């Protein structure tokens, strides 16, 4: 049974209040769908860059953007490219998982890890936990920094963590639950590699499910990457480097304080950015995006630039076969998402349905 040791210190209580105030401030900002999509994508790219950089990835932010958005390849950076592609796909999967499930589960966590390690593959099998001992060493001195639990204990420890998250007290704030889950996952170190990235994705998933995703606009990873020594120092709790010699029962209040400070910092940063970017006079229409599937979101973004589209445009945007694209256009026409403006059977043109036009800039 997992029973984390921590206290709600004055610092934790104060930071939680700051987080709540910043959360409500952002929710009330006038953000149009196009701006929201832009800020969301920026946050994903930032998270991908910083989370992989923490683990030693050598790509710059510009190179990460290039790798994700184009088919171009960087010289002698194949491994780095695969890492960022894998993380980016896993990050997108977090969003869909949070809509499909009201709780975290073991299968999704294993799938996230598989995507992280999949090098950009979208079809993968869930990762099994490690079957042997792993050791975390200092990159310079090679001395042992942390000795995680034995492989035979990993499965039970993970199940205990997941059950704790599911059954955590109703009055325990989501940010604290996310902080504890991050710490415990990193402590268990259930895989040989990819533990840090998966821990941060798990944190993001819990925040999404708990409605602390801030519309998907912020990146905690940047906060960690700005001072890596502080991040690792905050995680390094307990009297010994050995899990069984104090780490499993250590008081993690200091880690929670650090984690919440990062949240407050990130929330404040995106508030400032969104205020600068948002346009006065618009009501927040971003709730529309949560009602649309990912395909419709992409088409809505297309209509930000163009007046009409054809099934060939749908083919290119969504990477579909011609027949599938035509069938989808017909379905959307029936749903009044699209409306016909040119009745010719060949190269038939559509415009956005009347109901949805008001959501464009």
PLM regions and their residue ranges:
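FIC/Doc superfamily catalytic core
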Residues: 1-361
């Amino acid at each position: 049974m997992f029973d984390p040791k921590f206290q709600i210190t004055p610092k934790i209580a104060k930071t939680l209040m700051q987080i709540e105030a910043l959360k409500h401030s952002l929710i009330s900002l006038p953000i149009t769908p196009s701006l929201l999509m832009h800020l969301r994508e920026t946050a994903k790219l930032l998270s991908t860059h910083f989370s992989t950089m923490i683990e030693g990835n050598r790509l710059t932010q510009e190179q990460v953007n290039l790798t994700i958005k184009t088919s171009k390849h960087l010289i002698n950076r194949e491994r780095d490219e695969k890492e960022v592609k894998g993380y980016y796909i896993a990050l997108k999967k977090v969003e869909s998982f949070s809509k499909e499930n009201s709780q975290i589960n073991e299968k999704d966590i294993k799938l996230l890890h598989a995507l992280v390690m999949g090098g950009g593959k979208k079809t993968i099998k869930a990762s099994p936990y490690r079957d042997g001992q792993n050791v975390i060493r200092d990159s310079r001195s090679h001395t042992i920094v942390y000795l995680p639990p034995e492989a035979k204990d990993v499965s039970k420890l993970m199940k205990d963590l997941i059950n704790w998250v599911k059954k955590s007290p109703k009055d325990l704030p989501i940010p604290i639950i996310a902080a504890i889950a991050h710490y415990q996952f990193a402590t268990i170190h259930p895989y040989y590699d990819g533990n840090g990235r998966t821990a941060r994705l798990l944190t993001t998933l819990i925040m999404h499910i708990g409605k602390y995703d801030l519309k998907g606009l912020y990146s905690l990873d940047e906060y960690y990457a700005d001072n890596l020594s502080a991040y690792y120092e905050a995680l390094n709790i307990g009297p010994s480097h050995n899990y069984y010699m104090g780490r499993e029962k250590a008081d993690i209040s200091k880690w929670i304080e650090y984690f919440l400070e990062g949240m407050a910092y990130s929330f404040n940063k995106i508030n400032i950015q969104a205020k600068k970017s948002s346009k006065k006079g618009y009501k927040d229409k971003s709730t529309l995006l949560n009602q649309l599937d990912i395909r419709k979101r992409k088409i809505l973004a297309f209509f930000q630039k163009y007046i009409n589209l054809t099934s060939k445009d749908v083919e290119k945007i969504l990477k579909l076969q011609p027949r599938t694209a035509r069938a989808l256009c017909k379905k959307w026409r029936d749903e009044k998402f699209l409306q016909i403006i040119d009745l010719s059977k060949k190269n038939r043109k559509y415009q956005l349905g009347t109901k949805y036009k008001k959501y464009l800039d």
